Amino acid sequence: MGLTTKPLSLKVNAALFDVDGTIIISQPAIAAFWRDFGKDKPYFDAEHVIQVSHGWRTFDAIAKFAPDFANEEYVNKLEAEIPVKYGEKSIEVPGAVKLCNALNALPKEKWAVATSGTRDMAQKWFEHLGIRRPKYFITANDVKQGKPHPEPYLKGRNGLGYPINEQDPSKSKVVVFEDAPAGIAAGKAAGCKIIGIATTFDLDFLKEKGCDIIVKNHESIRVGGYNAETDEVEFIFDDYLYAKDDLLKW
């Protein structure tokens, strides 16, 4: 995957972030969880679940592949244990902590989280990385329909005060940082531009799913600052793998 060298500046009203695979590389931990979950369930194909369920709520995966265990309280308990039992298998997506800290340092709340993980698990991942959680921290416990439904990202953008504005889209420009097909579909359905993080899937796959910018990780992204007059935060992409031509006109 070749990187470009000409920086790209993107000015937006708000940014929404997935967590697993976007802020933290938790897939090895979650894979270990699924393998342990399936040890006493002969009908449960852990490798298949690992392959197809990235970006889903754990409850939705269990409801589909082990419906007898689809109890919300039970699933919440299972997920809360993942960072504790398997946390040593997880690391930050390179540059994620620095980027999140830069967003937290802005004078106005300009970012939110919308994850398919439960509240307990997502909070523990943030504690694991030492990142202060944003005010709007949307988890599996806060939505009726998980990704690929747009509800998580709609809640994030609406909470920050930037609902879809069909009359004047320039006043409600929101980007989603995502790595997974379900989240990309959710973000697009929520009227957002998609910044694809190539941690889980490759460049061609992310292009096929409709990402507007694709980066290897967060190391090449900087927060340029906040303009109170335009109510925009600037993201500067020093390197990127791909960008749609029309993005520069957004």
Curated annotation (Swiss-Prot):
Glycyl lysine isopeptide (Lys-Gly) (interchain with G-Cter in ubiquitin) cross-link, renumbered residues: K64, K144
Localization in the cell: Cytoplasm; Nucleus
Key word Lipid biosynthesis present: no
Induction line: By osmotic stress (at protein level).
A Gene Ontology cellular-component term: cytoplasm
Reaction catalysed by this enzyme: sn-glycerol 1-phosphate + H2O = glycerol + phosphate; sn-glycerol 3-phosphate + H2O = glycerol + phosphate
Gene3D superfamilies: HAD superfamily/HAD-like, Putative phosphatase, domain 2
GO molecular function: glycerol-1-phosphatase activity; glycerol-3-phosphatase activity; metal ion binding
Misc: Present with 5000 molecules/cell in log phase SD medium.
Name the record gives this protein: Glycerol-1-phosphate phosphohydrolase 2
Source organism: Saccharomyces cerevisiae (strain ATCC 204508 / S288c)
